[in-house]
């Protein structure tokens, strides 16, 4: 993706999607390559039912080992208020790093929406279930169908009932080949009640032990080309 082909935030195509969101009274997460300061950014726009853009998020964890080495990384994770629900966004490779969902939880997100486009999905959907569990936050991901791909999914943070009995937190899990519109419904009242009583998320973290998370030092076996861009 070249900078010249990336689009501005006021591009007519974005405006058209906003108009349709208002017309059909639906929320939309729209992704596009947008103009960064010097390079394109992989961005997502959250549009409300009135056709207003609530938030623009640019992907933080760009795939610097592949074509996205020429894409400018976003600098922060963001949360917006959509119809009384706090929404956060992750884009594809963001979900490989637990810090992404953790920061969104700390910023107040109740649901994380994940726009995705990759294969080898089985370990990745299990990781999303874990992100929901450990942050007490709902997670939903959309991924294009295809061999070894697909698996659009949604997970509730509710993993056990009041008696401590485990419950399946899978709300939706598509197969890899089926193409379609998938619906996932979260019981926000139940989720909020669960978050108010259980002991995960930001309840008993020991942040004084976490300073190493901010170090930029990389040692073997994790040294790769294109790091610390």
Model regions and ranges:
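Active-site catalytic loop in hydrolytic enzyme cores
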Residues: 19, 35-107, 116, 120-130, ...
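Metal-dependent catalytic neighborhoods of phosphoester/phosphodiester hydrolases
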Residues: 1-10, 40
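Glycine-rich, aromatic-flanked loop segments that form ligand/cofactor-binding clefts
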Residues: 25, 33-36
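CN hydrolase (nitrilase-like) catalytic-core segments centered on the catalytic cysteine
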Residues: 6-29, 96-183
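Short capping/connector residues at structural and topological boundaries
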Residues: 6-8, 62-67, 82-85, 102, ...
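A cross-domain feature marking catalytic cores of carbohydrate-active enzymes
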Residues: 32, 91, 143
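C-terminal beta-strand edge segments of enzyme domains
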Residues: 79, 144-229
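A short, structure-level motif marking secondary-structure boundaries and short turns
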Residues: 2-3, 85-86, 112-114
């Amino acid at each position: 993706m070249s900078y010249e082909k990336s689009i501005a935030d006021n591009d007519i195509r974005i405006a058209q999607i906003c108009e349709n969101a208002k017309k059909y009274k639906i929320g939309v997460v729209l992704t596009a390559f947008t103009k960064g300061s010097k390079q394109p950014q992989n961005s997502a726009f959250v549009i409300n039912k009135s056709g207003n853009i609530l938030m623009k998020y640019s992907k933080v964890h760009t795939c610097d080992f592949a074509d996205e080495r020429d894409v400018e990384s976003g600098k922060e994770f963001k949360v917006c208020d959509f119809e009384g629900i706090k929404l956060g966004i992750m884009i594809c490779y963001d979900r490989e790093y637990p810090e992404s969902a953790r920061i969104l939880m700390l910023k107040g997100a109740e649901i994380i929406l994940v726009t995705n486009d990759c294969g080898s999905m089985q370990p990745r959907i299990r990781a999303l279930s874990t992100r929901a569990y450990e942050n007490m936050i709902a997670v939903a991901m959309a991924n294009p169908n295809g061999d070894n791909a697909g698996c659009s999914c949604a997970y509730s943070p509710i993993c056990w009932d009041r008696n401590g009995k485990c419950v399946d937190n899978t709300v939706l899990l598509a197969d890899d080949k089926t193409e379609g519109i998938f619906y996932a419904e979260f019981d926000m009242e139940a989720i909020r009640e669960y978050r108010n009583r259980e002991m995960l998320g930001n309840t008993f973290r020991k942040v004084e032990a976490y300073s190493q998370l901010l170090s930029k030092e990389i040692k073997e076996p994790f040294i790769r080309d294109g790091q610390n861009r």
